[in-house]
Amino acid sequence: MVGYHQTNQKTDTGKTLTRRPVLVDHNRLPEGSRGRLAVAVAGDHPAAVQVTMTLVNDTGFDPVFSGSIAESWRQQPCTPSYCCDWEAATMLRAFPLAKKGEGRARLPSLYASFGKLGETPTHEDIIDNNRSINWPV
């Protein structure tokens, strides 16, 4: 499972580093493991795509090719594939569900919904929230 923590560490100037959830760990499951999260990879150059997909796999995620750079908007904020912790099969179903322009239109709803999660939402709270906004009804 991807883990997040809330940090209020201070810099040497006394300023807070971050109040946002920060990725501190991930599932690093072996290839073929049930529950392994998918990461979308887009690109126009097959060799570069292959290198990227190998890096994603070696990091413990299932690389899922999402198409060309021109089609990479399908994995932008508020699209069905964005920040929802999907496994590969669901991620592949998510790409064609994205409708151009709808992600941008959903951003205000996403921002408003984060304000309702409280000061220290759990990772599950954030993912449930993202899925409720990003996945088409």
UniProtKB/Swiss-Prot annotation:
It comes from the Bacteria. Residues 1-16 have a biased composition (Polar residues). Residues 1-20 are annotated as: Disordered. Encoded in the KpLE2 phage-like element. This is Putative protein YjhV. It comes from Escherichia coli (strain K12). The gene is yjhV.
